[in-house]
Amino acid sequence: MVLMIVSGRSGSGKSVALRALEDMGFYCVDNLPVVLLPDLARTLADRQISAAVSIDVRNMPESPEIFEQAMNNLPDAFSPQLLFLDADRNTLIRRYSDTRRLHPLSSKNLSLESAIDQESDLLEPLRSRADLIVDTSEMSVHELAEMLRTRLLGKRERELTMVFESFGFKHGIPIDADYVFDVRFLPNPHWDPKLRPMTGLDKPVAAFLDRHTEVHNFIYQTRSYLELWLPMLETNNRSYLTVAIGCTGGKHRSVYIAEQLADYFRSRGKNVQSRHRTLEKRKT
């Protein structure tokens, strides 16, 4: 059974995540005091029910040791996973402005900007031990819920899920990436007027990139690097490995290479997911 602990800065989407987990059959509790985690887990263990609990700045323990003690006292039947949601500062400010809600730390007479910054410091102990960090800055409510459904329902127990994610550097580097590879030096289909409207998922773009030796060399050396360290990553008790591939716009080169790497590791029996940030953003 899974005990999913959902945390993150206020406004990053914890309530949305909890509702999505409830739809997936998790028993969900919002803002449960950390010290009660073992009691909740023992109660649910007999019923064979996976649980999801949100922890935010309002119910953070006074010291990280209290959280560690609670985790150590969980029944063996539960496999704890920590999901940390985040968004960039400007996005959080905009979301609070849109909803006109008060920040949990506003009672300390802090400005919204100062409250967001202080909350980040207070939640750092949880962020640092998270199994999965998700940047929701560019996600809608529905995209966040769908992403969680895809990642959690697609994950096999005790198996590392490899996520290959394409992005454009001009849109920013994904904060949930474990590895970032820059492919802006590779031949660019953008300069071919016929290929410019297409994406790295289209066959003519794939054929263009496939003709270049440096593209093959990059893919080979990148997958060799990942294969070298994958056994150690798999034994490091982590649930996800996110590999981000970036080009200028996130439309051609990064998409093609992310798909090539995903197909390679999928063909070798790995649990693989692929995501294309720029292409997904264009659909909305």
Curated annotation (Swiss-Prot):
InterPro entries to which the protein is assigned, alphabetical: P-loop_NTPase, RapZ-like, RapZ-like_N, RapZ_C
Residues that coordinate or bind GTP: D56, V57, R58, N59
Domain of life: Bacteria
Coiled-coil residue windows: none
Gene3D superfamilies: P-loop containing nucleotide triphosphate hydrolases (3.40.50.300)
Molecular function via GO: ATP binding; GTP binding; RNA binding
Transmembrane segments annotated in the record for this chain: none
Binding site for ATP: G8, R9, S10, G11, S12, G13, K14, S15
Pfam families: PapZ_C (PF22740), RapZ-like_N (PF03668)
Region called RNA-binding, residue ranges: 266-284
PANTHER family in UniProt: RNASE ADAPTER PROTEIN RAPZ
Family listed: Belongs to the RapZ-like family. RapZ subfamily.
SUBUNIT field: Homotrimer.
Role according to the record: Modulates the synthesis of GlmS, by affecting the processing and stability of the regulatory small RNA GlmZ. When glucosamine-6-phosphate (GlcN6P) concentrations are high in the cell, RapZ binds GlmZ and targets it to cleavage by RNase E. Consequently, GlmZ is inactivated and unable to activate GlmS synthesis. Under low GlcN6P concentrations, RapZ is sequestered and inactivated by an other regulatory small RNA, GlmY, preventing GlmZ degradation and leading to synthesis of GlmS.
Protein name (Swiss-Prot/TrEMBL): RNase adapter protein RapZ
Organism: Citrobacter koseri (strain ATCC BAA-895 / CDC 4225-83 / SGSC4696)
